[in-house]
Every structure is written in structure tokens, then in C-alpha cells.
Amino acid sequence: MKQKIKSRLKKDNWLRYLSQTVAVCFLLLFISFFIFLLIEAAKTGPDFTKSLLGLEFNLGAKKASIWFPLLVSFVVSIGSLIIASYIGVRTSIFLVYRCKPRIRKKLLLVIDILSGIPSVIFGLFATQILSSIFRDVLHLPPLSLLNVIVMLSFMIIPIVISLTTNALLHVESSLMTVAISLGENKTSVIYKVIKKEIKAQLVVILVLAFGRAISETMAVNFILQSVNYQEVIANDRFFTSDLKTLGSVISTFIFSENGDEQVSGVLYTFGIIIFVLISFLNFFAIWSTRPKTLERYPFLKKISNFIYQVVWFIPNNIGALFTDLTARRQQVKKITAANVEQRATFFKERMQTNHLNKVYTSWKILQEIFCAVLAFGFVLGILLFVFINGSQAIQRSGSTVFSFGVDTTGRALVNTLVIILVAIGITFPIALLIAIWLNEYTKSRIAKNTFSFVIDSLSSMPSIIYGLFGLSFFLRTLQLSAGGANGTSLMAGILTISVVVLPFLIRTCQEALNNVSWDLRVSAYALGVSKREVIWKIVLPGALKGLIIALILTINRIIAETAPFFITAGLASSNLFDLSLPGQTLTTRIYGQLFSTNSTAVDVMLETALVSIVFLMFLIFLSSYLIPYLFSFNKQKWLQIKSKLQLWKKA
């Protein structure tokens, strides 16, 4: 009897020990990630180290001031954040309060498409379309910081819209009902009550969107080319210049011909600065909005208010002007027997107030419609640009979509598919085990908070930092390349992208497990079912739909990435196909054409962009429609379909 109990305990505990071991290894990965960055950054020479806090940037002269690239990064990020927050929040209000749920669901799918578009396609659109608008319509330099601000604003709009929409949908409906019953109109309630109710969430959204903007690298490289910071700033042409951001400086000089070990150390130092900055922003956003934190540190409310006021300075002042114009200033508040002779004045003032309230409401709705048209119009514009021009490029004689040679789009697609299959095979079991341990086994709040912070930090990490880690660890240390420490390989790209998507996959798997009703677990435990059996027979089957969607979203993320592959897998494919040899993906094929002197470079970009967009739209269709539709079928429906198929075969 004792032996049976022991054997059953061993069977029950093996999953716990395995998942716990994998979780600890993941934590060690995070620590080693930072250590390898520090080791490479330590190679910075004394001359470069002294110049980091100086005001001169010239890598050839061993001058590497951090301030100018960081200033450019902050300026373009704040500029894009102001535009994106204005458009995004008003579009969210339009979706939640002006659209029916069915229409809202379809429009949010369009936003999902925008969020899934690879950054290199944004860069291509900016150089081909936005640059023409700046040059021909606005009569401004086509490739400038202003172009980058507009491009980045539409890149971060999906974050603002999706998170703000989610926050608005979770506001208690009683707030709207009570305020309207007190005499306020719907629009006034939205902007004066509900918007203030989600103010804390809006600050978090702004911080997350800012982190996304400041970490963008590859799209920015399509536009910004200069590092002559002192000359440009001295000539007072900052916004019309093409000065590089901090992230684009890293990607530009990481494989520079004149780059040595010290230059590489400087770039790793820049990467650590971005890493620390993004981690701090995410930690501050989550920590500062907790009720207990706000009670203990009241000054955090002032900081949140300051961030909110800076970003919303112009919209708030315009809104305050209209509020002032439409404010009630009735001299006669109420008609009684004592002032019945003033009834004419009372009705006149009330009609004027109602008219001004209608003006206020119309102005707000007009802004919402305008912002929604801008957001969805941009998606339509970029899709039409890719489909029309990409289709024309494919029809030309030089198209390589259906070729699989060395320098072809077909070969890039094959490389991308191989990377997806191997990376998913590596990351999914690891992510699922960690999610099971966090969700089903561990009871420690400290452990959960620690892993939550690590996962959030790694999820928000700029992909260029992962590329630096892959270069340092997989190529220079493990030498997973046929070319040795100085080479690139598909295997290094696969392992690097596995590290990139692992935190995202852990979080989505955890959400899928959380969506399984806890009542099912409790009922099973009450019947004497072991935890291992509950996980295998109840939790995992119940979470199957969410896990499949998590896999599809992860594949989407892999396709959209560029920076990790650019650094670890290379910009070109080798003559032979081998995981130890370099190979370009769809996105690095687009990016690689920036350095090509071939006259067909733009056509190659367009045809590859079309293949990428079609692939991504297919995945979004799977995750948003097909998978939920299939899982909505019950057993009886499947039997009906089976019987119809059998009858069809007999006929």
C-alpha cells in the first residue's frame, strides 16, 4: 500500500518538479542576459568611457556622447506619443460609445492588422508615401525627424487603442447611468466622468506606448541617416534633420567596417541604457498605479498628473475652451410664483444653453470621427500601397516570389517557415511548463511577482537588445555558425528569436490557463483527482483554444521581427541551406535592400512586403475567426457535419 502511495506521489510530483526547474532556468536566462550585455559593454575603452557623458559624437575619434542620440529618441517618442494618444483615445471612445459591439469587433480586427505589420513595412511606406507628402504637399525635407514622428505615431496607435478600449469597457456602466439621470448628456459624461475614471490606466498606457516608440529601430533606419549632431543642432534645423536615434545608432554601427572591440562595447553600453530605461518605465507604470503604493507615496499622483498634463496639454486646453463656452450661466435658475414675470428670460437662456451643449457634443463627436478615419484610413492606405505596388512587382519579369535560389523571396519565405517551426518547437513546451508552474503550483506571492516583473521586462525589451545578446552569446561565445565567431547563422537567429518570443508566449499561455474556470478544478479536487490529472485532463483541454491562439500570435510576432535576425542570421542567404549558415527572412530581405545598388531593390521590397502582409492577415484570420468558430462547435454539430459528408460520399 505504501509503495502504491509513493509511486502515485512520484507521478503527481514529476510535473511540478519539471515545471519548477524550467522556471528557475528561465530566471537564470534573464540574469545571464544582463551579464553578457555587461561583459560586452566592459570592453569599452577609457577614451570612449570618458566621452559618454560629454557633448561630442564621433566614433572615429573615440567620442560617443549618449546625450544627443538620447535627446533625438526622446523628442521623436514624445512627439509621436502626443499624436498617438490624441488619435488613439478618441478612436477608442468612438469604438466603445458610438459603435455597436459587432461593428466594434470588426474594427478592432483592423487595429490588430495594423499592430501586426512589420516595422520595416512602416519604414518602406514612410520613404515611399509619407516622404512624398512632406516634399510635395508640405514643402519640407522628405526624410526627417518629422516623418519619423508621424510614422511612429501610427506604429504605437494600436497599443493606445487596444488598451484604452479595454479600460473603457471595464468602467462600471452605473457611472454613465447615474450621471445622465442627473441631467448631463452622454458626451459630457464620457469626457468629464469616465475619462477621469480611467486616468490612472491612461498614464500606464502612455508610458507603455512611449517605451514602444523609443525602442523602435529598423523602421527608423529607413529615414534617418545622419550622426552629425553638433552641426545640425548648431544650425537650428533639428526637426527637419535626419539625425539618428539611439537604437538606430546601434544597428548602424554594430557591423561597421571601422568598428572594433571598443566601438562594439560602446554600442552594448547604449543597449544597456535602453534596457534599463525601458525596464524602469514598465516597473514605474505598474508600481505607481497600485492603490497601496499611491497611499504610501502621495507624490506619485503628482508625477502621474504631470505626465498626463504634458501629453494632453493641447487637447485639454481646447476642451477647456469649449467647456467654458458651453457652461451654463443662467441668471434665472428656476421659475416660481415670486419670479414668474422672468419666465421669458428663463426660457431664452435655457435654449441658448441647450444650443451650446449641442455644439460641444457635435465638436467632440466630430473629433472622434476624424481620429477614427485617420486611424483606419492609415491602415487602408498602407494595405492598398502594399497590395497594389506589391502585385505589380510580382507581375514583373524579375520577380523571385516563386523562385528558391540564393537571393530570392521564395528562399526568404522558406527560411522564415523553418525558423518558425524550430523556434515554436523550442519555446512552446518551455512556455507552457512555466505557465503551468506559475498558474497551478506556486503559492508564493514573491515568486509570482518576481516572475511577473521578469516576464514584463523581457516582453517590453527592444528587439535590438536581443540581437546584441544573440551576437554575444550564440555567435561569439558558443560560435553557432560555420563562419565561427565572426559569422552569422540561421541557428543563432532561431535561438535568439526563441528568447524574444518566450516571455510573450509564457504570458499568453498563462492567460489561456487562467480562462479555464476554477470551479472545475475545485470540483475535481473534491472528487479526489490529483493535481497532475486535473492539469492534463481538465485544464489543458479547456485551455486548448487559448493555447492555439497563443501559438498563432507568437508566429505573427516571429514574422514581424527584423532586428534579431539582422544581427544574428544575416542579411543574405548562403548558397547551401544549413542551420549553421546565414539566411535572410522576409523582413531582413526588405531591410537588406536599403544597402543594395540594384535598380530592382524597391520592387523586391514591395513583393516581399506583400508576401509578409498576406501571411500575417491569414494568421490574424485564423486567430480571430476560424479558431473561435471551430471551438464554438459542440459535439452534436460535428456529428451532423460528419453525417452530411458521409451522405455526400454515398451520393
Curated annotation (Swiss-Prot):
One of its GO terms (biological process) is phosphate ion transmembrane transport. It is a multi-pass membrane protein. It is found in: Cell membrane. GO terms for cellular component: plasma membrane. InterPro entries: MetI-like, MetI-like_sf, Phosphate_PstA, Phosphate_Transport_Permease. Its main location: membrane. SUPFAM superfamilies: MetI-like. Signal peptide: none annotated. The chain crosses the membrane at residues 22-42, 64-84, 107-127, 143-163, 203-223, 266-286, 368-388, 417-437, 451-471, 486-506, 535-555, 613-633. One of its GO terms (molecular function) is phosphate transmembrane transporter activity. Pfam families: BPD_transp_1 (PF00528). Keywords: Cell membrane, Membrane, Phosphate transport, Repeat, Transmembrane, Transmembrane helix, Transport. Residues 70-285, 413-623 form the ABC transmembrane type-1 domain. PROSITE patterns: ABC_TM1. It comes from the Bacteria. Belongs to the binding-protein-dependent transport system permease family. CysTW subfamily. Could be part of a binding-protein-dependent transport system for phosphate; probably responsible for the translocation of the substrate across the membrane. This is Phosphate transport system permease protein PstA homolog. It comes from Mycoplasma pneumoniae (strain ATCC 29342 / M129 / Subtype 1).
